[in-house]
Regions:
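Loop-to-transmembrane helix entry/capping segments in MFS-fold secondary transporters
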Residues: 1-5, 198-208
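Helix-loop-helix hairpin linking two adjacent transmembrane segments in secondary transporters
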Residues: 5-48
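C-terminal membrane-cytosol helix-exit motif in multi-pass small-molecule transporters
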Residues: 38-57, 246-254
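Juxtamembrane intracellular "pre-TM" segments in multi-pass secondary transporters
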Residues: 52-83
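Short amphipathic helix-loop junctions that connect adjacent transmembrane helices
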Residues: 98-113
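Helix-to-loop junctions at the C-terminal end of transmembrane segments
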Residues: 128-141
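Structural signature of the two symmetry-related core transmembrane helices
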Residues: 144-158
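Intracellular juxtamembrane helix-capping segments at the cytosolic ends
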Residues: 183-196
Length: 331
């Protein structure tokens, strides 16, 4: 699910790159803002009238951010690699597009015709990255494929910096850039959800999304600053060096384990019993991670606080019946 969401984020950028020049050419810069406003209203109507009504029964930690956990999660060694990664990825994207459209114009492609190059290059890069996603998931090679995509991103940025200005050199570099970008954009949310500690997925996703948009914000500032001091071509070099830092960080990622998350309402009422059950759970075969949160009220209307157990398990090994029996023992 998370990989699919990531893919559609990448596709939305693809369509934005195609439609942007067309709308701007037809209606001017103000037309872009009117078009964005129209799409926003359309999205609101879709949510209101097309998304099925549902009542969420998800425990609090998996659906919303928990402020008391944010500081700890920011320092999490594995999650921080992804947070810095998405920051650098979107910083590079924003910074590069300060100068990339100008370079296409200089190579002979009129601004209003940029969609003619963005459409095939972005769609081509999308189809190029799909086989690598399939191989990574089927062969359980997510970590080397991930590092390879970051390396490809670095290569594309170095090529944009090194190669002499020309239409086909730009096309080659942009295809490589967006192959890496689309792969990373699609896979990082999935990796993040698998690395997230049990019971704090809402906080983890919040930090990740904030890093993503802060990266886009920083890209505009850093790109403009570098261009004013050293020229626009230097933007590619600075972003390539930043991506090399990310590549070094990616080598420290842990190998991803196949796991599934469960949450259970328990009959545990005291902190002492929660500690005892946590120890028993973590020693059971197939339990990768166990978190018991004592202060979440049940939704049954009784108002009595029961602990919620958040478990990350290996489905091939774990005995869920034994787990449920332990969690529902009367004390």
């Amino acid at each position: 699910v998370m990989a699919t969401i990531g893919m559609f984020i990448g596709l939305s950028f693809t369509f934005a790159m195609i439609l942007g020049p067309i709308v701007a050419d037809a209606f001017g810069l103000s037309g872009l803002f009117w078009f964005t406003g129209f799409l926003t209203i359309l999205a609101m109507l879709m949510i209101q009238f097309m998304v099925p009504y549902s009542v969420s029964k998800a425990p609090r930690g998996d659906s919303v951010a928990l402020p008391e956990q944010i500081s700890k999660l920011i320092r999490h060694p594995q999650l921080s690699r992804l947070n810095w990664g998405v920051f650098i990825l979107h910083m590079a994207l924003t910074a590069c597009f300060i100068t990339l459209p100008k370079q296409f114009v200089a190579s002979g492609l009129a601004l209003e015709n940029h969609w003619q190059i963005y459409l095939p290059t972005l769609l081509g890069s999308f189809f190029l990255m799909v086989p690598f996603m399939i191989i990574a998931m089927k062969k359980q090679q997510e970590k080397p494929m991930f590092s390879g995509a970051v390396a490809l991103l670095s290569l594309a940025l170095f090529l944009l910096w090194l190669l002499p200005l020309g239409f086909w050199s730009l096309v080659l570099s942009v295809v490589l850039f967006f192959t890496a970008f689309n792969y990373l954009e699609a896979t990082m949310p999935s990796i993040l959800s698998r690395l997230a500690p049990a019971g704090v997925k809402g906080s983890v996703m919040g930090i990740y999304s904030s890093s993503q948009f802060l990266g886009a914000f920083a890209g505009g500032i850093v790109g403009g600053f570098v261009a004013s001091l050293y020229g626009e071509q230097s933007i590619f070099l600075v972003m390539a060096l930043m991506s090399l830092i990310w590549l070094a960080l990616s080598f420290g990622m842990q190998k991803l384990k196949k796991s599934k998350s469960f949450s259970f309402i328990t009959n545990i009422h005291t902190d002492e019993r929660a500690e005892e059950v946590s120890e028993l759970l973590i020693n059971m075969p197939g339990i990768i991670e166990a978190t018991l949160v004592q202060d979440e009220p049940r939704t049954s209307g009784k108002g009595k606080a029961h602990a919620v157990a958040y478990l990350k398990v290996d489905e091939k090994i774990v005995d869920l019946l034994a787990v449920k029996a332990l969690l529902h023992q009367e004390t």
